[in-house]
Regions:
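Glycine-rich phosphate/adenosyl-contacting loop at the front of the ribokinase-like
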Residues: 1-73, 94-96, 113-115, 273-275, ...
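Short beta-strand/loop segments at the ligand-binding rim of alpha/beta enzyme cores
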Residues: 158-165, 171
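Conserved phosphate/ATP/ADP-binding segment of small-molecule kinases
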Residues: 171-261
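A short helix->loop->beta-strand "cap" motif at the edges of active sites that frequently abuts
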Residues: 153-160, 232-236
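Conserved post-catalytic alpha-helical subdomain immediately downstream of the catalytic base
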Residues: 264-334
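Conserved N-terminal subdomain of the carbohydrate kinase-like
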Residues: 48-135, 327-341
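Acidic-glycine-rich active-site phosphate/pyrophosphate-binding loop
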Residues: 5-19, 251-267
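Hydrophobic beta-strand scaffold residues
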Residues: 49, 75, 161-162, 193
């Protein structure tokens, strides 16, 4: 099973610890991006994972590629082009002070990329599963057109397509609403991943559910999933993540999955003293792709995804540096955090 993920990887510049921007004269530099984060998770689980993007021809991009290779992600299909590397700045939240992200992605290499820039015959060679998110079509009109081209080309080759809807209100700035684009892209998706806001903003599908209440109304979330699957008969299933934010460093975390026949709900984790929640959704997506391809039942696949994402909240950086063994131990109830000897 070979998985190809496609999107933008950025230079991540984070204020140290819980400091505000430039409270001290330094920023911690790493790399991250939704689709790359998924590829790293899959490589950590032993899957054949490839990452496709467009990067400039400079030393920072080379460092980024080397970082992906360190985790075992295949980078041979990365295209080099004009433009620059996107950047995002991060402040880590605590208690009632939320985390903050500032994007600097204009004129990045992938934002400038357009249909025809990628040879899809080469890109999809040997690929069984293709993963994309709603972030890439948000960054520019040409990236949106390239994203639509990618899923259409994937389906021409009978490749399974997963999409994390990932609505980002601060990125949709080129004149189109997210729903105008994502409702078209969703026609080519087999496995959808979202939260309630993603479904509402990206697909304009709503059900009266209240995540903040801390209670999962099974029938309402089942109805939300049913509405999506009825609107998009091409979809085989949709997974909806459920985050209850008590504060910036204390979240409840669970998910449900609807395949049109059965409705599955995961265990709920109370995650206190969060180290870094950025990449938590991507670690769920990576866990779900792994789970759907390694477990015979969808309940186990869902539990693997939620447990993997739970662990990511305790790891600094975008990447989920855990193994299958780490995840299955938590699935099995070993969440004490005791020293492993």
């Amino acid at each position: 099973m070979k998985v190809l993920t496609f999107g933008e990887i950025m230079l991540r510049l984070k204020a140290p610890g819980h400091e505000r921007f430039f409270q001290s004269p330094m920023l911690e530099a790493t790399f991250g991006g939704g689709e790359a984060n998924v590829a790293v998770s899959l490589a950590n689980y032993g899957m054949d994972a490839e990452f496709l993007t467009v990067l400039p021809k400079n030393d920072i991009a080379e460092c980024c590629i080397r970082e992906l290779r360190y985790f075992g992600v295949d980078t041979k299909k990365i295209v080099r082009g004009e433009g620059r590397m996107g950047i995002y700045y991060l402040e880590g939240g605590a208690n009632q002070l939320p985390s903050k992200v500032v994007y600097d992605r204009a004129y990045s290499s992938i934002a400038l990329a357009k249909p025809g820039d990628i040879d899809w015959d080469k890109a999809f060679e040997g690929v069984d599963w293709f993963h994309i998110t709603g972030i890439t079509p948000a960054i520019s009109e040409s990236a949106m057109e390239l994203s639509l081209e990618s899923v259409k080309e994937a389906k021409k080759r009978n490749i399974t397509v997963s999409c994390d809807l990932n609505y980002r209100k601060n990125l949709w700035k080129y004149g189109k609403k997210a729903s105008e684009v994502m409702r078209e892209l969703a026609k080519y998706v087999d496995v959808a991943i979202a939260n309630e806001e993603d479904v509402q903003k990206s697909l304009e599908i709503t059900v009266d559910v209240n995540v903040e209440s801390g209670e999962l109304d099974r029938e309402k979330y089942r109805a939300l999933g049913n509405k999506v699957l009825e609107s998009y008969p091409n979809m085989k299933c949709i997974a909806i993540t459920l985050r209850e934010s008590h504060s910036a460093d204390w979240n409840g975390w669970a998910a449900c999955l609807n395949d049109g026949k059965d409705f599955y709900v995961s265990k709920k984790y109370e995650i206190r003293d969060i180290i870094d929640r950025v990449g938590g959704g991507d670690s769920f997506a990576g866990g779900l792709i792994y789970g759907l391809n390694h477990y015979e039942d969808k309940q186990s696949a869902l539990e693997f995804a939620v447990a993997a994402s739970c662990l990511k909240h305790s790891i600094p950086g975008d990447f989920n540096r855990v193994t299958v063994s780490d995840v299955t131990k938590l699935m099995g109830g070993d969440g004490t955090g005791r020293v492993q000897r």
